[in-house]
Amino acid sequence: MYTKKPTIPEDVIERAYRGKCTKEDALLLLEGNPFELFELANDLRASTVGDAVSYVVNRNIYITNKCVGNCGFCAYRTEKGYILSVEEILEKAGEARKAGAVEVCIQGGYIPEADIEFYLEIIESVKAEFPDLCIHALSPMEVNYAAGLSGMSVEEALHRLKKSGLDSLTGTSAEILSDRVRKIICPGKINTQQWIDTITAAHKAGISTNSTIMYGHVETLEERLDHVFIIREIQKETGGFTELIPMAFLPYNNPIGEKMIASGKFSTTGLEDLQLIAISRVILHTYVKNIQATWVKLGKKLAQVALQCGANDLGGTLMEDQISTASGGSNGEYVSPAEFEWMIKGAGRTPMQRDTLYRKVEPVIANRVEPLPGLGKTKIGSRD
């Protein structure tokens, strides 16, 4: 149990351990000594998931960089881009499998070509060729957009996606779950309630998802906290979230970031990043077991420090991350299993390779330091 409590009130600590943290408690913890918050979060982590730190050998596959959206935080979208063919997607999935991947994360933009049939063909093809690969794909926004193009309900779209072989839905397109914020940074996306409804429908259809928060732009501290509490309320109802992934906004090469920098505001500080990870652990205690410290946003060293602040997962090998790179990310696109093991052991913890659903898997090619030739290089697709 957490015992050093010189400034945190006893009732706040008691509620944290019971999974009853309030918004007022969270604000108080953030206003206090950050290292006391980190210690509390770290103890809650230990009591929930122990000392194992997980990671997944996976690959991002970006099927297109075209998008009709108008998100102000995006530096990846282009009107004249590529669309990968099914054959090219299968080639990338095959490269990933040879590198020991157990998951492919299929991502893209919103394009008129991408109706439900578009995604069904991709998912069915990948699953037929690589039945043991977990397919983690589509955001709530993509599901809504594709369902609309196909003239069907979100529920029917989710049913068909699951039947085709979709294993897990991404919890992206959440950004900040505040309609005030969304009208500024992503006015063309689904609103907060639509995101909640889509995620809830996915969980009820038997499709698990992760959850995300993209912070550090125009939102207030209270809006950040409200977002995490919304995640908690959904989890109380469905139990379908596997994790929370806090993702700091990268304010480079995009309109929102340009305005921020012009006003003298830059990316989040390391302390701010660690505080959000820690307070997320406190708020979500007993509900969402896994909190990820994403190395591609935080950098490897800060991600390692986050393991002492409530995080218990380092994310995936990725093999490519075009979205972060386009927004000025400088932490690379690939971490080998061997380096993950090194980082985790260096933090005094026990490494554990996992799959998308946080099930332990036997280490595959754990000593591979470099990706296979061709990984991280996106070919221009022919499907347009």
Curated annotation (Swiss-Prot):
CDD domains (UniProt xref): Radical_SAM
Organism domain of life: Archaea
Residues engaged in binding [4Fe-4S] cluster: C67, C71, C74
Domain Radical SAM core, residue spans: 53-286
Cofactor list: [4Fe-4S] cluster
Keywords tagged on the record: 4Fe-4S, Iron, Iron-sulfur, Metal-binding, S-adenosyl-L-methionine, Transferase
Catalysed transformations (reactions): 5-amino-6-(D-ribitylamino)uracil + L-tyrosine + S-adenosyl-L-methionine = 5-amino-5-(4-hydroxybenzyl)-6-(D-ribitylimino)-5,6-dihydrouracil + 2-iminoacetate + 5'-deoxyadenosine + L-methionine + H(+)
UniProt EC number: 2.5.1.147
Recorded metabolic or biological pathway in which this protein acts: Cofactor biosynthesis; coenzyme F0 biosynthesis
HAMAP family, per the entry: FO_synth_sub2
Protein name: 5-amino-6-(D-ribitylamino)uracil--L-tyrosine 4-hydroxyphenyl transferase 2
Gene source species: Methanosarcina barkeri (strain Fusaro / DSM 804)
